[in-house]
Amino acid sequence: MRALAKLAPEEGLTLVDRPVPEPGPGEILVRVEAASICGTDLHIWKWDAWARGRIRPPLVTGHEFSGVVEAVGPGVRRPQVGDHVSLESHIVCHACPACRTGNYHVCLNTQILGVDRDGGFAEYVVVPAENAWVNPKDLPFEVAAILEPFGNAVHTVYAGSGVSGKSVLITGAGPIGLMAAMVVRASGAGPILVSDPNPYRLAFARPYADRLVNPLEEDLLEVVRRVTGSGVEVLLEFSGNEAAIHQGLMALIPGGEARILGIPSDPIRFDLAGELVMRGITAFGIAGRRLWQTWMQGTALVYSGRVDLSPLLTHRLPLSRYREAFGLLASGQAVKVILDPKA
C-alpha cells in the first residue's frame, strides 16, 4: 500500500510503499477513503521545534480521516466489516486518574494517531476498534474525515454554560474557528463576531457571523463594544496569537467566559489580576474531544443538517500530489484540504 511518512528528522514527507497491516486483538483494519491535512501535520512537515520534540520517525502521518472497515481482529464485535467510520485520533489508557474520572480527553497516557503511532495518510491503517465512530453510509467520506477536528469546535462551543442566547466573539478563523462559527449560529447565539487577519478565511465566516473583523484594519475592542454595547459574554479563542488572546479577554464583560483551544507557539505573559481575577472571568482550557459526548453532540448537528461542513472542503487532491496539498494549506489560501489515498 502507499503511505505518506516522516522517514527522517528533517523537513518534508515521503510517499512510500508499505505492507498492508493486519489487525490484532481489539483492532480493526480501515480502508482509508479520505484524509484531511491538519495544522499538526504542517508542524510535522516543517519539522519545527514541537515536531522535533515529539515525533519519532519513521511514522505514517495523518489523524483526520475516514473510511470503510475492511477487517476486524479477534474479539471485535463492533464496528463490523463494511461499516463506514470516522476515527477518534486519541487512544486513551482507561486507567489513569483522568480516565477514571471520565476525562478521557486529557488522558495522561494519550497516544495520537499520526503523531505517536501510524496514522491515516495511507491506503490502509490499523486502529483500536473503540476509536471508530460508525457513520450513516450516505455521509460523504470527505465530511466524515473532518468530524474529528469538528469535535474540537463542538467541545469549545459547548463548554461551560454554552452559547444559546449569548453574545460571542471568535478569535481565529482557521478551520476549527470556522466550524465553531457554524455551531454557534446553529445553537442560537448572537450577536456573533469573528476576527481574523486573513481575508480569505475570514470571508468563509460571513454566513454565520453578524460582524467580521480584520484586526489589522479595525480596532477589535472598539467594534465589539459598538456591536454589543458593552462586551461579549463568551470568547472562543482559536488563534493561539498573543495579541488576539489579550484582546479577546478584554472584550469580555465582567463575569464572562473564555474558552481557549488555540495554543501559542511560545509562552505568553498576561495580567492575571486585570484580565481575569478582578473581572470575574472564567477560563476553560479545551483539549481534544470529550469521549464520547462531543462526538454525539457534533454528529447530531451534522446528521440533522443543522451544520453543513462541506463549504469548508476547499480542495481535493490525490495523495500523489501531497506537496501541492501541503503548500496550499501553508499559504493560508485553503481551509480543509482532502487527500485521496487511492489516487
Curated annotation (Swiss-Prot):
Its predominant location is cytoplasm
Q: Which residues form the active site?
A: 40, 43
| Catalytic activity, as annotated | L-threonine + NAD(+) = (2S)-2-amino-3-oxobutanoate + NADH + H(+)
Compartments, as annotated in UniProt: Cytoplasm
Say if the entry is tagged with keyword Ligase: no
Q: Site Important for catalytic activity for the proton relay mechanism but does not participate directly in the coordination of zinc atom: give positions.
A: 148
Q: What is its EC number?
A: 1.1.1.103
Q: SUPFAM superfamilies from the xrefs?
A: GroES-like, NAD(P)-binding Rossmann-fold domains
Q: Binding of NAD(+): at which residues?
A: 176, 196, 201, 261-263, 286-288
Q: What does this protein do?
A: Catalyzes the NAD(+)-dependent oxidation of L-threonine to 2-amino-3-ketobutyrate.
The name this protein goes by in its record: L-threonine 3-dehydrogenase
Q: Which organism is it from?
A: Thermus thermophilus (strain ATCC 27634 / DSM 579 / HB8)
